[in-house]
Curated annotation (Swiss-Prot):
List of catalytic residues: H248 (proton acceptor)
Organism listed in the record: Parasynechococcus marenigrum (strain WH8102)
Chemical reaction(s) catalysed: a UDP-3-O-[(3R)-3-hydroxyacyl]-alpha-D-glucosamine + a (3R)-hydroxyacyl-[ACP] = a UDP-2-N,3-O-bis[(3R)-3-hydroxyacyl]-alpha-D-glucosamine + holo-[ACP] + H(+)
Gene3D superfamilies named among the record's database cross-references: Hexapeptide repeat proteins, MurE/MurF, N-terminal domain
Taxonomy of the source species: Bacteria, Bacillati, Cyanobacteriota, Cyanophyceae, Synechococcales
Gene Ontology biological-process entries: lipid A biosynthetic process
Function summary: Catalyzes the N-acylation of UDP-3-O-acylglucosamine using 3-hydroxyacyl-ACP as the acyl donor. Is involved in the biosynthesis of lipid A, a phosphorylated glycolipid that anchors the lipopolysaccharide to the outer membrane of the cell.
Domain of life of the organism encoding this protein: Bacteria
GO cellular component: carboxysome; membrane
Tagged with keyword Lipid biosynthesis: yes
Main enzyme class: transferase
Pfam family, one: Hexapep
This protein's name: UDP-3-O-acylglucosamine N-acyltransferase
């Protein structure tokens, strides 16, 4: 694909194309990181990117750049074709769609798929080998159901969803439009509900359901549990990484992002636009306000106000955590000082 053709495609996108210098208008075969790119590949740089130094000797064919004069001057001096955009990372994502367009599977039903006669599969949907779809389930139009997916009874899947190999949707689960459930993810599994008795643990029946609103993506190996009653709800546009556990009765707002190994205990309430970094834990019934950011391994035991940035275990304001971390490294020296003071203090 010629760089000039790619520029025309970016003009219709959302990355804010400002201007471009086509140079020799390279024919691009793909994309790569700047320090690994070849003459027929595209790359990008953001302001302050650690790879900026690589631009002086990179073999890259074309670049997406921020409006940063030193980078523009260097690219011009080296004769590299480039485009200046408001958001280079977003432009790169749009460019990858152009350079590597997805090939949709043919819209048919594989002969090894097992579909209950009371299930409905919408037009334009592709159902791959060894898929199982239970009674009363409805799969919308233009969906892609990859091999080995199991859809239990009474599941409703809206239009344009994609279920990757071996994903499992338990009874009563509801998926909005354009949801993606990746391989080995489980939606609607039984919540961890048991009642202690004199004879041991008595299982609490989990009769609720899981609802994924429009545009939710669930990573590989993640699980979203259904509650005993009511629902577990994931807000529209929320993105869930691999190996995330979301407990029964949790609700999240719109546009959240949860990184790998996040664990959210039952009944927690997560606001809109919340970002939880890797291995963050949220306690049972904790309320996390809108736009909260929690750094990796933070343990959220109590409610967190909207807009807060928290770190540490238990989670505290990030700036306070930085001061505590700095003090922690000085504890051995402080302990020695205290011991010396005790030795030198008359009893």
């Amino acid at each position: 694909m010629r760089f000039s053709s790619l520029i025309k495609a970016l003009q219709a996108g959302e990355s804010g194309l400002r201007w471009s210098q086509l140079g020799q208008d390279p024919d691009l075969s793909g994309a790569a990181a700047l320090d690994q790119a070849l003459g027929d590949q595209l790359s990008f740089l953001e302001a302050g990117n650690v790879l900026s130094a690589s631009l002086s000797d990179s073999a890259v064919g074309a670049l997406l750049l921020p409006d940063q004069q030193d980078l523009i001057d260097l690219a011009s001096q080296r004769g590299i074709a480039f485009a200046v955009v408001s958001d280079p990372r977003l432009a790169f994502a749009e460019a990858l769609d152009c350079l590597h367009p997805r090939q949709r599977p043919q819209a048919d039903i594989h002969h090894t798929a097992v579909i209950d006669e009371r299930a409905v599969v919408g037009p334009g949907t592709a159902v791959a080998a060894r898929v199982c779809i239970g009674a009363g389930s409805r799969v919308g139009a233009d969906c892609i159901v990859h091999p080995g997916v199991v859809i239990y009874d009474d599941v409703v899947i809206a239009d344009g969803c994609e279920l990757h190999a071996n994903a499992v949707l338990h009874p009563g689960s509801r998926l909005g439009r354009r949801c993606v459930v990746n391989s080995n993810a489980v939606v609607g599994s039984e919540g961890f509900g048991f009642v202690p008795t004199a004879k041991g643990w008595r299982k609490m029946p989990q009769t609720g359901q899981v609802v994924l609103e429009d545009g939710v993506e669930v990573g590989c190996g993640s699980t979203i549990d259904r509650p005993s009653v009511g629902e577990t709800r994931i807000g529209a546009g929320t993105k869930i990484d691999n190996l995330v556990q979301i407990g029964h009765g949790v609700s999240t707002g719109r546009g959240c992002a949860f990184a790998a190994q996040v664990g959210i205990a039952g009944g927690a309430r997560i606001g809109h636009g919340v970002i939880l970094a890797g291995q963050v834990g949220v306690a049972n019934r904790a309320v996390v306000g809108d736009r909260v950011m929690a750094s990796s391994k933070a343990g959220i035991h109590n409610d967190v106000d909207a807009g807060a940035v928290v770190s540490g275990y238990p989670a505290i304001p990030h700036r306070l955590w930085l001061r505590c971390s700095a003090a922690f490294s000085k504890l051995p020296e402080l302990a020695r000082t205290v011991r010396e003071l005790k030795r030198n203090t008359p009893q």
